[in-house]
Amino acid sequence: MSRDPLNVLIRRVDPDVPLPTYERPGDAGADLRTTESRELAPGERAVLPTGVCIALPEGYAAFVHPRSGLAARCGVALVNAPGTVDAGYRGEIKVIVVNLDPRESVRFERFDRIAQLVVQQVERVRFQEVAELPDSARAAGGFGSTGGHAAVGGASGTSGSAAEGGATGGNRYASVVSDREGQ
């Protein structure tokens, strides 16, 4: 079942920047481009302008996601992924990038695709304070509690001594930003 696309108002801050586009049918994110050329040394971060401002309808938000190719090929990540663009924000969308490669600089040229913009319907909720929350299967299990990786308890979701860092349990928690020297 197909429906008409949501109309989002957009204004170019840079008159030459291409508007965000979906590269292929079915893509969730429209590509955002930088309007600045910039080189990032290993470990350096920068705020890159996209040259566009948007006006989202009430009940919607846009989320700035990383481009997987930049992460896989260059070690580029977004510091606050996903970045949230609220419906009431009218300023230029900017993208906070970081070069996680320990050895190589990465260069962005004007109009390079740097991120993806995903527009989604969002709910405003009313928070109701209670003394106790209802029980669930997960309960208070947090980071790594479901396993699935050797560093957090085994490749098959191991529990018990392996999950506690035993003979096959790895170090239990994987580092979010690891030292990539020697890779």
What feature does the model see in each segment?
Residues 1-183:
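DUTPase catalytic domain/fold
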